């Protein structure tokens, strides 16, 4: 093999939280220097076998899907075998189906609408379905022989199992089905964001596969390993700008009318409200927009016509956007997987640069979610303490009566065979993947609220950027000046200026003396801070109409000495 696995690490006696322990003894990591998945793995494929699953971790745009179409599918067809591709969202599935139709000269490509293509799954030796359709696909008796001829099962966007676990209680069951029912096929998992799903994937492949073959058929198992191919990530094309509220980008949108914006809101209501506040230059889509012309344009042509597209997480794993005019992405999430998946929807061309406007969560919202996660974990612990199915069923029924979907998602019912094998029984189970995700998120929020780290520091590490480089506030202040050069500032512009000055003041090493009043600082207070900031040669002056304006100003020598000392 071209990329030899790293040696197993020496065993360290260390207490690791259960939600943070990765089965490193099962994963064999291959550090791949290439930036092309197809070029790097073309000579690896022939070494793969069903006992050893494959995880391809590569940044969006490195050709994971191209590798499937140009390497895996031709190999399967040449051996008269089949390929099953499982994708996350319907939109992603449509894009893949269009590409398959082009490859096979399928006449349906020019006859069907996008809605019609969504309903197509059968492409002969190739089938494309969503994760949500998997159980129905496995129950289809007429497809039994087709499934027996599978050579590859491709689980695209494999972070689905954890990213969707908080609103899809069957993610764990879907993962179990893949590792169990497709144990004789080569299973290829692909994602750009693996950190949350590494542990569940490893445990499912190690446990369920053995259950499927080792105990059921009694076959002798050869040595198994999970091949983990890790490709280099490059985030140099992104400039990070942190904002306190999504409203702050409105002034920048007005200043950059020639640039397109992709805005991810954390709720439908907020998205619709924000889109409406921008007027005719913005459009809004969400999960209910599948029949809209805007959605059809995105799916088929991978671009939008408006200056601003406001959406929810419906796009985070669904649609790719190829449009050089999109130079700004606004993101309202603190979840690492979701954030990077949103960023990845915009595919970059050579020399392209994109500004990421990332909304920092407030302490109030962090505290509220920390309490929610703590309450949910306590419920799961209460469920685990119950010994009988009758007790567990009563416990869950009480939750269902309460009607809180955030709590109901923690449990589900499963039909299994009774021990006497003559009848079935209904089991009440906990959503183990949801428990795992909640525990990880609770730990992350706890670090933010305790002061152990900051949101900016964490996000900067996700993009491999030093914190001081993540947002050059001085450049933003200069941009603000150039846009509003010595002109009266509006009521909307003044809060932006206040924020820039306070951030620069703190970055210069000073402690903000009025942290609870930064949103109401007066002209003199802001000028006092400007006088102490290195290279901040600006001052706020007042016009005859009592309005503020930002002007160039070289502060006196005393201040200059302070600047040189910093």
Q: Where are the predicted features?
A:
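N-terminal helicase ATP-binding lobe
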Residues: 1-190, 194-308, 314-341, 345-566
């Amino acid at each position: 093999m071209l990329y030899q696995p790293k040696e197993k690490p020496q065993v360290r006696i260390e207490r690791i939280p259960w939600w943070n322990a990765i089965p490193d003894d099962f994963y064999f990591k291959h550090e791949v220097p290439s930036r092309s998945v197809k070029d790097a793995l073309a000579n690896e494929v022939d070494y793969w076998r069903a006992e050893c699953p494959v995880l391809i971790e590569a940044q969006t745009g490195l050709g994971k899907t191209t590798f499937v179409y140009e390497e895996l599918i031709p190999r399967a067809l040449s051996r008269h075998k089949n390929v099953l591709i499982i994708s996350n969202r319907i939109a992603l599935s449509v894009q893949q189906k269009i590409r398959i139709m082009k490859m096979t000269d399928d006449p349906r490509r020019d006859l069907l609408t996008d809605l019609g293509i969504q309903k197509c799954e059968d492409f002969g030796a190739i089938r494309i379905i969503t994760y949500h359709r998997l159980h129905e696909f496995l129950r289809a008796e007429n497809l039994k022989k087709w499934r027996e001829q599978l050579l590859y099962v491709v689980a695209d966007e494999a972070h689905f199992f954890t990213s969707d676990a908080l609103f899809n209680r069957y993610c764990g069951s879907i993962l179990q089905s893949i590792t169990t029912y497709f144990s004789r096929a080569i299973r290829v998992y692909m994602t750009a964001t693996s950190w949350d799903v590494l542990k569940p994937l490893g445990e499912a492949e190690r446990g369920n596969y053995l259950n499927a073959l080792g105990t059921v058929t009694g076959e002798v198992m050869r040595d198994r390993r999970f091949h983990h191919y890790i490709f280099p990530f490059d985030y140099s094309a992104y400039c990070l700008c942190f904002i306190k509220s999504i409203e702050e980008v409105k002034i920048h949108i007005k200043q950059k009318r020639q640039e397109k914006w992709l805005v991810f809101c954390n709720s439908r209501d907020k998205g619709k409200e924000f889109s409406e506040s921008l007027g005719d230059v913005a459009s809004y889509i969400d999960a209910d927009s599948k029949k809209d012309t805007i959605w059809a344009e995105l799916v088929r042509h991978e671009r939008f016509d408006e200056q601003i597209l406001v959406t929810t997480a419906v796009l985070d794993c669904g649609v790719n956007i190829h449009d050089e005019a999109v130079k700004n992405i606004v993101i309202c999430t603190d979840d690492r997987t979701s954030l990077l998946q949103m960023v990845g929807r915009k595919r970059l061309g050579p020399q392209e640069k994109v500004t990421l406007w990332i909304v920092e969560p407030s302490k109030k919202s962090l505290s509220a979610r920390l309490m929610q996660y703590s309450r949910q974990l306590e419920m799961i612990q209460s469920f685990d303490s119950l010994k009988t199915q009758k007790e567990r069923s009563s416990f869950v029924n009480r939750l269902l009566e309460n009607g809180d979907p955030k709590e109901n998602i923690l449990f589900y019912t499963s039909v299994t065979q009774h021990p006497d094998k003559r009848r079935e029984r209904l089991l009440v189970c906990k959503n183990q993947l949801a428990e795992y995700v909640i525990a990880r998120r609770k730990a992350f929020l706890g670090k933010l609220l305790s002061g152990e780290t900051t949101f900016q520091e964490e996000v900067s590490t996700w993009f491999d950027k030093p914190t001081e480089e993540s947002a050059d506030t001085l450049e933003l202040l200069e941009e603000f000046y150039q846009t509003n050069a010595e002109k009266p500032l509006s009521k909307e512009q003044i809060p932006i200026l206040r924020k820039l000055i306070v951030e620069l003041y703190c970055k210069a090493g000073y402690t903000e003396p009025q942290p609870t009043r930064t949103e109401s600082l007066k002209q003199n207070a802001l000028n006092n801070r400007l006088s102490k900031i290195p290279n901040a040669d600006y001052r706020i002056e007042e016009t005859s109409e009592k309005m503020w304006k930002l002007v160039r100003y070289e502060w006196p020598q005393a201040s200059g000495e302070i600047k040189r000392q910093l």
